[in-house]
């Protein structure tokens, strides 16, 4: 029955469909489309965005965690890691739900997914927006004095990140309360069902939420980034700590580019959101294509952010080069078999005779080791001793020569010379 009704909807005229659904407020990314093209194009775009964004964010997270493992984490690196975690959460959980809803045209993902879909998406986006404000503030502090480290205590970092996610989860909470599944025209839909008692509250929510999540954070972040950039321009004129000043300027430009790009790609989604939430009775519905593309642009932020980090950050580029060199230079360990030569066979090929250095040298690691290790090495390595050399040292130790006991060796030196002649 549901599929038959959906087929009728798909074949119907778009104007009739918009009129029949004009009074409905869809949620969870669900949007019944009267075009088969949109039901194919939008999921394909979301799949491409998810694939590229997942790989990019995975690289950023891996490089940041590797840096944390090698040295103490910094505040800015922790905030960038928070942005990447929010991005990868959107690509793993929210975007697939939107793509599935577009493909099927009927909401069959259940009541819980309907209630939590918009809330989870807006929670991650709000966390990113608040993180940009903190990043801009920390960036300004770093630009003011690059030699002075910004508070990097683990307790401070974890408290700040926890506060960001708590606030971000509370702001879109009304969407959780009023999103639910409803049957309409024989089709299961995910809708925002606001009772008459809460109509005024939701009207106020529709006005305040964009201000708290988008406009105000954008203004604060822009203010701090502007001050940080001006501070970098002033300090770059001086010659002291030039390296830290250049690094501060590059960091400011990179984070500013990320914030501006995110704001521009998020703007169409807010236009569609405000249009739907403040739609008057009998007013025109926003075009379905505009709503669908605005959601694709919103998710594409999670793909663009890691690309900006990887292209503009010298640390990330150095990390990628290191990984690439490790991958192309890694070779399997080749174990060479050492052939034992009999003790009596000391013949060697011409031109292949070992030099005296190779016969008597000892590795530096064994030479610099402890006395016990050097003793064990001496026991294991048996150096052959020639008979003449052994006899010489034996006679020298047992019977000292007359020359050693001669009190006036210079008088006998001439006699020895004559005897030799």
From Swiss-Prot:
Glycosylated residues (UniProt): 18
Gene Ontology CC terms, in alphabetical order? cholinergic synapse; plasma membrane; presynaptic membrane; synaptic vesicle membrane
Q: What disulfide bonds does the UniProt entry report for this chain? A: 114-190
Q: Which InterPro entries match?
A: GPCR_Rhodpsn (IPR000276), GPCR_Rhodpsn_7TM (IPR017452)
Residue ranges, Extracellular side: 1-44, 96-122, 178-204, 280-289
Please give the start and end residues of each transmembrane region: 45-65, 75-95, 123-143, 157-177, 205-225, 259-279, 290-310
> Which UniProt keywords are present, listed alphabetically?
Cell membrane, Disulfide bond, G-protein coupled receptor, Glycoprotein, Membrane, Receptor, Transducer, Transmembrane, Transmembrane helix
Q: Is S-adenosyl-L-methionine included in the keywords of this UniProt record?
A: no
Kindly list the GO molecular function terms attached to this UniProt entry.
G protein-coupled receptor activity; identical protein binding
Source organism's superkingdom? Eukaryota
Where does the entry say this protein is expressed, by tissue?
Answer: Exclusively expressed in neurons of the habenular complex. The expression is particularly prominent in the medial habenular nucleus, whereas the lateral habenular nucleus exhibited a lower level of expression.
Q: What's the protein called, per UniProt? A: Probable G-protein coupled receptor 151
According to its UniProt entry, this protein's organism is: Rattus norvegicus (Rat)
């Amino acid at each position: 029955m549901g599929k038959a009704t959906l087929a009728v909807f798909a074949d119907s005229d778009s104007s009739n469909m918009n009129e029949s659904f004009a009074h409905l407020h869809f949620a969870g990314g669900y949007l019944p489309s009267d075009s088969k093209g949109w039901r194919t194009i939008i999921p394909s775009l979301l799949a491409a965005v998810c694939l590229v964004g997942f790989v990019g964010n995975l690289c950023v997270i891996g490089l940041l965690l590797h840096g944390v493992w090698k040295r103490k984490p910094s505040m800015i690196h922790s905030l960038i890691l928070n942005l990447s975690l929010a991005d990868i959460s959107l690509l793993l959980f929210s975007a697939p739900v939107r793509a599935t809803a577009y493909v099927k045209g009927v909401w069959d993902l259940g009541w819980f997914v309907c209630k939590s879909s918009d809330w989870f998406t807006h929670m991650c986006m709000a966390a990113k927006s608040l993180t940009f404000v903190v990043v801009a503030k920390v960036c300004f502090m770093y630009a003011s004095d690059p030699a002075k480290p910004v508070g990097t205590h683990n307790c401070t970092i974890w408290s700040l990140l926890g506060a960001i996610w708590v606030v971000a989860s509370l702001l879109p909470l009304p969407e959780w309360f009023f999103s639910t599944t409803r049957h309409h025209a024989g089709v299961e839909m995910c809708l925002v069902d606001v009772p008459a008692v809460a109509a005024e509250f939701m009207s106020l929510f529709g006005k305040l939420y964009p201000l708290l999540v988008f406009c105000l954070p954008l203004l604060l972040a822009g203010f701090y980034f502007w001050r940080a950039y001006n501070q970098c321009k002033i300090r770059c004129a001086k010659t002291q700590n030039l390296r830290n000043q250049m690094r501060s300027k590059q960091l400011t430009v990179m984070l500013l580019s990320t914030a501006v790009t995110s704001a521009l790609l998020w703007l169409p989604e807010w236009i569609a959101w405000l249009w739907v939430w403040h739609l008057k009775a009998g007013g025109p519905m926003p075009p379905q294509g505009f709503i669908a593309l605005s959601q694709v642009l919103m998710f594409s932020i999670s793909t663009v952010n890691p690309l900006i980090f990887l292209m503009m950050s010298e640390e990330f580029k150095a990390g990628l080069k290191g990984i690439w060199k490790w991958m192309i230079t890694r070779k399997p360990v080749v174990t060479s078999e050492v052939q034992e030569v009999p003790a009596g066979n000391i013949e060697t090929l011409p031109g292949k005779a070992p030099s005296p250095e190779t016969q008597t040298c000892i590795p530096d690691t064994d030479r610099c080791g402890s006395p016990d290790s050097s003793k064990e090495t001496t026991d294991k390595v048996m150096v052959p001793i020639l008979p003449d050399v052994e006899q010489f040292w034996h006679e020298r130790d047992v019977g000292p020569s007359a020359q050693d006991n001669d009190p006036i060796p210079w008088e006998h030196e001439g006699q020895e010379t004559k005897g030799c002649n």
